[in-house]
Amino acid sequence: EANKAFDYFSIKQRDLSNIWEFEPFHFNDVDVLTEEFSDYFYDYNEGDLLISSRSLNSVFIIDPQTLKVKNLFFGLTRRQHDPDWNKGYITIYDNQTFWGVDQVGNEIRDYNSRIIKINYIDQNKIETMNYDTSFISDARGNNHILETDNTIFSLIISPYEGKLLLFDKNKNIFSLINNQEGDVLPFSNGKILDKKKLVQNINLCKK
């Protein structure tokens, strides 16, 4: 979905207040602009910080030397986590945490979680990355994108489902569900450590 309407007023939402004390900012993740990606973002410099504030539904780009806020993305996500620099775009794990109430007073959830993509050249172009397997989380959650010459791999962690999902473009090619005797054991902070070995192993599995 492109160019979704901004969601400004959900910062008033007091989700998970029965579990945690409410924090007005709750900075929950930071990603450093590395040399690998800095050439794709000419308005930013290597070392600039991409910082997520869960409670404000906001992601900031900050110069760590001057503390200048170079950019702000507000109202695009709800209770997001894990913003990442990529090759000319930014991805954010959008929990889309929101509960409604059905006719008998039970809490219901209208939306799954998602990964959004913000194009650097045209920042008004906001896309939801489409995958053939859904995931849903209230907090945490992370993603890692690996682009090769001919495809894009996405690693997605849905912590409270105990899900680790690996996608080749939009197709799920590997899943790990961390359940034990009906209990979910949460995952957190998955990352592709050896990019070359991942591609080699996937190619071997295809043969």
Residue ranges and their predicted role:
Residues 1-207:
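Histidine-/acidic-rich catalytic cores in large beta-rich domains
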